[in-house]
């Protein structure tokens, strides 16, 4: 049985938001909320400054706290590793949002129910890759079967120095980062010390500016 996951290669991500736009288009995600978003970190002092990017979304955890706490089983672990949701069962109680350590869930303002990245399950079931993977111009998002030792994603996880977000939560996430850092992966690590600036493009204004 497959066990699907993602690798985000921070060495190549250029922060173009193609993944965010593709996800919104694929799933009709409303303004003001995102299933996937890009985090920016500015480091240094101009002109010796740098900008780093990192894509954040549902981690598709094997031990997902959102599925455990959901009172209606609207969120559930599939046998292929994808954490999916059924908005017809959701009652909008926001328990999943409180339980998720990755801030991956939101309430759809049009439906009043929880939503998040579901690995484009409808595409995967028809042998297509998730929309974000297809559109990334630098192939910074890699998807695939973690149980297949010959898959690209398995090779990257085995051979590269990968990190996961909030490993101390013991959620066993299926989302791995290459060239990650505490500042990129943990919002609590970005306490301002004058050397970097964190920016998340998740607001209504940012969405409108991007035309998404």
Which residues make up each language-model segment?
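Sequence context of c-type cytochrome heme-c attachment sites
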Residues: 3-9, 25, 33-58, 74, ...
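Solvent-exposed, charged amphipathic helical/linker segments at domain boundaries
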Residues: 112-121
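Short Fe-S-cluster ligation motifs
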Residues: 45-61, 97-104, 122-134, 160-180
